[in-house]
């Protein structure tokens, strides 16, 4: 059985930065460190940080006075940010800079009194944080997930209207929604640069190339990871058997029985150790040496806050 690896796969710059912020805070300040929401949507990462003293909470009221608080990579609303400011807390922001870009787009639209439409998945923390950047009562902020949502939507003023997107959406699905928005609201204005992040786009492009060769595609990622779900869905749409797995233990032998080629990729919040474990399990089931496919090179790095820029090896 041939094993192919998608390229790129796994951690993106925003996830790397967010995890480093929590790790460095633990090294510098010691446990406990409070993190609002899972810092990234990966069970292995969250469990590892929890074992080292990170406490994951959903409400600022759960954080004691004088504590260290970190916002997750998904970002938070202005209301949450203001609540944290009102408390005796030391706050570090692990929001992905590419999510912050979308926040700024919404905030600008709010200041101008333009209504805004966000394309995203209801209930996702990134969506909640982005929607929470809009505060102008004279305007409006709306959420759509599909072309059907667009055709049902009514706004106050179609002449002053803009749209943004969640950063981890399906590129193809989002294109369909944007097409519907432009037909429904001809004067709507979009972002100068695509809101779907480079890592999401690159990983979807990579899984498309992977699925062209593999009969079965395994996506390493947690069930609550938006970008990981989109990878599995894309492979399924291409007619392949695709499975979203947290780790090697989730692999069922019948998935790869008599399969000649299996492809492996990982969502942007899944560490490479999990991919290595999956490959090892596939090799136990008859797989050969893993072959990485050619793909787009990624060299983007997002710096941690200057207060946390320390070599953790130097910290006792």
UniProtKB/Swiss-Prot annotation:
InterPro entries given in the database record: LytB/IspH
GO biological process, one term: isopentenyl diphosphate biosynthetic process, methylerythritol 4-phosphate pathway
Top-level taxon of the source organism: Bacteria
Binding positions ([4Fe-4S] cluster): 12, 96, 197
Catalytic residue positions: 126
Positions with a binding annotation for dimethylallyl diphosphate: 41, 74, 124, 225-227, 269
An example Gene Ontology molecular-function term: metal ion binding
Pathway where it operates: Isoprenoid biosynthesis; dimethylallyl diphosphate biosynthesis; dimethylallyl diphosphate from (2E)-4-hydroxy-3-methylbutenyl diphosphate: step 1/1; Isoprenoid biosynthesis; isopentenyl diphosphate biosynthesis via DXP pathway; isopentenyl diphosphate from 1-deoxy-D-xylulose 5-phosphate: step 6/6
Pfam families in the cross-refs: LYTB (PF02401)
Gene3D superfamilies named among the record's database cross-references: 3.40.50.11270, 4-hydroxy-3-methylbut-2-enyl diphosphate reductase, catalytic domain (3.40.1010.20)
Reactions this protein catalyses: isopentenyl diphosphate + 2 oxidized [2Fe-2S]-[ferredoxin] + H2O = (2E)-4-hydroxy-3-methylbut-2-enyl diphosphate + 2 reduced [2Fe-2S]-[ferredoxin] + 2 H(+); dimethylallyl diphosphate + 2 oxidized [2Fe-2S]-[ferredoxin] + H2O = (2E)-4-hydroxy-3-methylbut-2-enyl diphosphate + 2 reduced [2Fe-2S]-[ferredoxin] + 2 H(+)
Positions with a binding annotation for isopentenyl diphosphate: 41, 74, 124, 225-227, 269
Record EC number: 1.17.7.4
Comment on bound cofactor: Binds 1 [4Fe-4S] cluster per subunit.
Keywords assigned by UniProt, alphabetized: 4Fe-4S, Iron, Iron-sulfur, Isoprene biosynthesis, Metal-binding, Oxidoreductase
Needed cofactors: [4Fe-4S] cluster
Binding residues for (2E)-4-hydroxy-3-methylbut-2-enyl diphosphate: 41, 74, 124, 167, 225-227, 269
The protein's role, per its UniProt record: Catalyzes the conversion of 1-hydroxy-2-methyl-2-(E)-butenyl 4-diphosphate (HMBPP) into a mixture of isopentenyl diphosphate (IPP) and dimethylallyl diphosphate (DMAPP). Acts in the terminal step of the DOXP/MEP pathway for isoprenoid precursor biosynthesis.
NCBIfam families: ispH_lytB, PRK01045.1-2, PRK01045.1-4
Family affiliation: Belongs to the IspH family.
Quaternary structure and interacting proteins, as annotated: Homodimer.
Protein name: 4-hydroxy-3-methylbut-2-enyl diphosphate reductase
Underlying gene: ispH
